[in-house]
């Protein structure tokens, strides 16, 4: 019995080769899912690193701005994909569309809504691919378990056909079946961990972008209030002359 068991190839590749076609399909699917997980990890890690560093740099540069026009001049030196520049453009576009309106509070409210929608859209864009990670992390263990159950069923069928409980007959089939579960866990665990890492990074990135949006809204609010005060000064001066 021991010699027969030793002659059986129980390496990972050997177990795969001797596995049932259904179990093989399960293993291949799980391996592909793992490849997708790591591809998303490396691609999005580079994306997060570059985007976050760029946004931090732009935020520091915009901190010196004292008006929306000055912020726009600073943003002119940003890259074409600059999100900070897009937020500034949103505020300027709302000012252009609201020309002639004396309701400054309404302008601020509409600008805040536009900036909020832009930040939300960026968050959705940065979160692309996370759905795949969540799906892989959720279903991979069960897919692997399906392969295990199928493999064990085949092992029992083999026992019935050979009419023996010899370990050399039973062990290889069970090992092949358990390999499917192991591959399922190998696919699922990194997917869940990477998903949580990216979820935190997206939250942090959106918070930083929200700070930039608040800074843009602050500059616009200051400009509107200063313009309103400047427009009101001649009126107050005329009223004083009449009273005098």
Curated annotation (Swiss-Prot):
Gene Ontology MF terms in the entry: transmembrane transporter activity
Nucleus found in the keyword field: no
GO terms, biological process: bacteriocin transport; protein import
Keyword Transport among UniProt keywords: yes
Its membrane topology: Multi-pass membrane protein
InterPro entries given in the database record: ExbB/TolQ_transport, MotA_ExbB_proton_chnl, TonB_ExbB_1
GO CC terms, sorted: plasma membrane
Transmembrane intervals: 21-41, 133-153, 178-198
Membrane side Cytoplasmic: residue ranges: 42-132, 199-244
Cross-referenced PANTHER family: BIOPOLYMER TRANSPORT PROTEIN EXBB, PROTEIN TOLQ
Its job: Involved in the TonB-dependent energy-dependent transport of various receptor-bound substrates. Protects ExbD from proteolytic degradation and functionally stabilizes TonB.
Protein name: Biopolymer transport protein ExbB
Organism: Salmonella typhimurium (strain LT2 / SGSC1412 / ATCC 700720)
Taxonomic classification: Bacteria, Pseudomonadati, Pseudomonadota, Gammaproteobacteria, Enterobacterales
């Amino acid at each position: 019995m021991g010699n027969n068991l030793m002659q059986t190839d129980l390496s990972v590749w050997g177990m795969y080769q001797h596995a049932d076609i259904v179990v093989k399909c399960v293993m291949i699917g799980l391996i592909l899912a793992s490849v997708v997980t790591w591809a998303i990890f490396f691609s999005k890690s580079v994306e997060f690193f570059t985007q976050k560093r760029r946004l931090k740099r732009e935020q520091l540069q915009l901190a010196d701005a004292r008006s929306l026009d000055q912020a726009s001049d600073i943003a002119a030196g940003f890259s074409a994909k600059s999100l900070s520049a897009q937020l500034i453009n949103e505020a300027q576009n709302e000012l252009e569309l609201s020309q002639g309106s004396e309701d400054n509070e309404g302008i601020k409210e509409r600008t805040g809504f536009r900036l909020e929608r832009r930040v939300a859209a960026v968050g959705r864009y940065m979160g692309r691919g996370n759905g795949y990670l969540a799906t892989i992390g959720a279903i991979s263990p069960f897919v692997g378990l399906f392969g295990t159950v199928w493999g064990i069923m085949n092992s029992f069928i083999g026992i019935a056909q050979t009419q023996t409980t010899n370990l050399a007959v039973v062990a290889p089939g069970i090992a092949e079946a358990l390999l499917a579960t192991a591959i399922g866990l190998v696919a699922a665990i990194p997917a869940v961990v990477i998903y949580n890492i990216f979820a935190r990074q997206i939250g942090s990135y959106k918070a930083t972008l929200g700070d930039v949006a608040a800074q843009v809204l602050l500059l616009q609010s200051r400009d509107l209030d200063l313009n309103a005060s400047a427009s009101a000064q001649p009126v107050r001066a005329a009223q004083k002359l009449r009273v005098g």
